Design a protein with these regions (language model features):
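Helix-loop-helix "hairpin" substructures at the membrane interface of multi-pass membrane proteins
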Residues: 144-222, 245-250
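Membrane-embedded helix boundary and interhelical linker motif in transport proteins
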Residues: 31-85
Length: 293
């Protein structure tokens, strides 16, 4: 029973991080109809900023103080602020162009962000494992489980609930959904579409940055992590449906569960099983489980 609970917690841990990335990706597409290929590197950017901020505050001390955990959202804030700059400067001029232009500019942005992170922080990984170790472990029956992993699960669940409440229970959420349904009609009714777009893009980037920020104490920040995360985020949104927050949540939970089963029983083909699951969903429901045709 202890082993089963550990596997469930590991599934939820991975699902929490994947939802933060895929949820932001789906939000951006749902409102703006842009597939942001640079989204994974915004996740990596959040990880690097948090690792740098906490590392600078830690100052080489062997143990972390509790107040350092308040610096974890720094990467999310930085990613959101970067999104607020990128949307009006790089993306807005392309809304009336063909989708190929949007893919090219976001792919170029992916490469720029990768080189920018290499330039600022160098080619070597950044680690703040002291925050991961400082919380210790909890006893679950005869097993132990890292306490920080539970923090990640709680943050992921809180982010999912907060995003749902923001989109479906606030006035701006109504405007956001109206713009996603019909941008021209929303503009005709007096909605500032440009403001909606920049805020939606910033929120999506904030979520990606938050994913990187909460995972960096456990995994560290390393070049290339954004591309790996982007690929798996696309698996999530393919399963759940691109543009659907509910689909991103369900897809993240499914991917987390299948990945944990794969690591446990057939680690050699773990990723192949995820891609096969995504392919089967595409065959049965091309728009995903919750996607709109």
């Amino acid at each position: 029973m202890d082993t089963v609970l550990i596997h469930v917690l590991n599934s939820l841990l991975y699902a929490s991080v994947m939802f933060l990335i895929a949820g932001g990706l789906s939000l951006i597409y749902g409102v703006m109809r842009i597939v942001n290929l640079a989204h994974g590197n915004l996740y990596a950017f959040g990880a690097y900023v948090t690792a740098w901020a906490v590392g600078a505050a830690l100052g080489g001390a062997p143990q972390a103080s509790l107040w350092l955990y308040a610096l974890l959202p720094a990467g999310a804030v930085a990613a959101g602020a970067l999104g607020a700059v990128l949307e009006p400067t790089l993306l807005r001029p392309l809304y009336r162009r063909a989708e190929e232009y949007q893919l090219l500019i976001t792919f170029g942005l992916l490469l720029i962000l990768e080189d920018l992170m290499r330039l600022i922080w160098g080619p070597y990984p950044l680690s703040i494992s002291a925050l991961y170790e400082a919380l210790g472990s909890l006893a679950i029956g005869e097993s132990i489980y890292p306490t920080y992993n539970l923090v990640v699960i709680v943050v992921g669940a809180a982010a999912a609930a907060g995003l749902w409440a923001f989109v479906y229970r606030t006035q701006f959420g109504v405007v956001l959904r109206a713009t996603s349904q019909n941008m021209r009609m929303a503009a005709a009714l007096g909605v500032n579409v440009n403001r909606v777009y920049v805020e939606a893009f910033s929120i999506g980037c904030f979520m990606a940055g938050l994913g990187g920020a909460i995972v960096v104490p456990q995994q560290g920040a390393v070049l290339g992590m954004g591309v790996d995360a982007l690929i798996l985020a696309f698996v999530v949104v393919v399963i759940g449906g691109l543009g659907s927050l509910e689909g991103a949540l369900v897809g993240a939970v499914l991917v987390g569960a299948v990945r944990e089963l794969g690591i446990t029983f057939f680690p050699e083909i773990e990723l192949a099983v995820l891609y096969l699951m995504a392919a089967l969903v595409l065959l049965i429901r091309p728009a995903g489980l919750f996607g709109r045709v």
